[in-house]
Amino acid sequence: MIMIKIGQGIDVHAFHNNGQQQQYVVLAGVPIEHTHSLLAHSDGDVVLHALADALLGALALGDIGQHFPDTDAANAGLDSRVLLRYVYGKVLAAGYMLGNADITVMCERPKLAVHNLAMRANIASDLQTDVSNISVKATTTEKLGFTGRQEGIMANAVVLLVPNTSGV
């Protein structure tokens, strides 16, 4: 019997005016110009944080806060792609690999459609898979809630892990 694993992760960060003239948010490792940055201990990449939590959850390995606590100064400003590659190393070490990932970003702004392929390509590269196995979608909450008021951004990720038969 083939044992597949499914994981789900969610991450939220508040928008923050950092006082800089040019501000941006980082989503799936892609810097995107915006009116605000994100308030976070690391780079605040909600896409990669949700994805990393989904990968860890599929294997019951806790969450990114346990592996990268915000109380550790070494994690300040951490590039979330480094975090994701570390987590994926744990997936490979457990004998699994990514089947596919489906990620939804919830925000009114910034608009993400023009960044979709770059986000998917970064994730595919970090997870050693084809871009066709990575879905990134964006939606609004029709001006409802904290995302609708443009106070923050949220991402939800679902992953399917399959036994690693590739020898990687």
From Swiss-Prot:
One of its GO terms (molecular function) is metal ion binding. Pathway: Isoprenoid biosynthesis; isopentenyl diphosphate biosynthesis via DXP pathway; isopentenyl diphosphate from 1-deoxy-D-xylulose 5-phosphate: step 4/6. The keyword DNA-binding does not apply. Its cofactor is a divalent metal cation. Its EC number is 4.6.1.12. InterPro entries: MECDP_synthase, MECDP_synthase_CS, MECDP_synthase_sf. A divalent metal cation binds at D11, H13, H49. It holds the Pfam family YgbB. Binds 1 divalent metal cation per subunit. One of its GO terms (biological process) is isopentenyl diphosphate biosynthetic process, methylerythritol 4-phosphate pathway. 4-CDP-2-C-methyl-D-erythritol 2-phosphate binds at residues 11-13, 41-42, 63-65, 68-72, 139-142, 146, 149. Belongs to the IspF family. Involved in the biosynthesis of isopentenyl diphosphate (IPP) and dimethylallyl diphosphate (DMAPP), two major building blocks of isoprenoid compounds. Catalyzes the conversion of 4-diphosphocytidyl-2-C-methyl-D-erythritol 2-phosphate (CDP-ME2P) to 2-C-methyl-D-erythritol 2,4-cyclodiphosphate (ME-CPP) with a corresponding release of cytidine 5-monophosphate (CMP). HAMAP family: IspF (MF_00107). This is 2-C-methyl-D-erythritol 2,4-cyclodiphosphate synthase. It comes from Psychrobacter arcticus (strain DSM 17307 / VKM B-2377 / 273-4). The lineage of its organism: Bacteria, Pseudomonadati, Pseudomonadota, Gammaproteobacteria, Moraxellales.
